[in-house]
């Protein structure tokens, strides 16, 4: 804090070449630290060698106490500043791992989980595509199965129709055979009747008539009937063989188609069974992948919640540390401002001390060379310098001119 002193008008000379210098015995300071303490000097004629009046001694003592307290306060502030710096350094060293925690392991775990999730998603997509392909293949096989089933039904209906035709032909054959048998019986009956009639006529006529008639040659009915029978039998046999050959051919073709259809049906059924097994296995694997995905999502959610809570705690800790650091910085700025104020006060005090020292030295140069003959402003002799009045005064040393000293720019005072 600045000191306000009432300084009297002082006439300071820059050189003391016109006056003798004060002897070395008279340049000694009467108070400890008086060379560095500003003094309240009223007039150059108020003091003489080794003597001050009471007000000047009290002022010097007061200024000495003030300067000592000021220096003690400066030392105390420097010690406090050093302690605060050490405390800040220790706090920064202690809280450095808290301010910069290592999340590399958590980041690696999160990256691994993300990679697993991506792999699971890709595997899930691949399984979905495979399931869709299996469904499409199953639909194709189902369509083929329906087509083959309709073809089989058509072939079975054709076989049933051919069987009905075969039954009809068999019935026709049996009817024709029955007609042939009836015709044979009728022929036999006609033959027997004819023979009986011939015999009867022979018996009636006897030997009475011998009629020779040139008649046309008789027709052998048996031969005609046999020929007709053979023709019909040949025709029936031909028709039968043709029908049997056609039926055999159709039956063989149908059997081949049935065999091929049954083989294809068995292969299709085996493929359908295999596809059903594959679909069941894929559904089980898909369910397992869904469960794994759900568990991974739950784990990720728990990890995110845990890490978010830890991050909030760390952020709150960082906020507290930043607030403490801001408070410490504000305290440091305030103490720095106080320290700057004290430095300014110290500089002003040093300037005043230098000014007072220059004034004291200039007044010391104005003292006479013989201190015993010095008189005060009232023209009253001041006692001898020595304590023993009988001891003569020692002649002073020869005067050495004082060299001019540089002055301080801001306060226009002498530099030590």
Swiss-Prot record:
Region span, Coil 1B: 103-203
Q: Where is this region: Head?
A: 1-56
Where are the annotated segments for Tail?
Answer: 364-416
Q: Where is the IF rod domain?
A: 56-367
Q: Name one GO cellular component term.
A: intermediate filament
Q: Where is this region: Linker 1?
A: 92-102
Q: Could you tell me the superkingdom of the organism this chain comes from? A: Eukaryota
Record-linked Pfam families: Filament (PF00038)
What keyword terms does UniProt attach to this protein? Coiled coil, Intermediate filament, Keratin
Name a single GO biological process.
intermediate filament organization
Q: Has the keyword Coiled coil been applied to this entry?
A: yes
Q: Where is this region: Coil 1A?
A: 57-91
UniProt cross-references to InterPro entries, sorted A to Z = IF_conserved (IPR018039), IF_rod_dom (IPR039008), Keratin_I (IPR002957)
- Tell me the segments the record calls region Linker 12: 204-219
Q: Does the keyword Coiled coil apply?
A: yes
Site (Stutter): give the residues.
305
The text of the family note is: Belongs to the intermediate filament family.
**Anything else of interest in the record?**
There are two types of hair/microfibrillar keratin, I (acidic) and II (neutral to basic).
Q: What is this protein called?
A: Keratin, type I cuticular Ha1
Gene name, Swiss-Prot/TrEMBL: KRT31
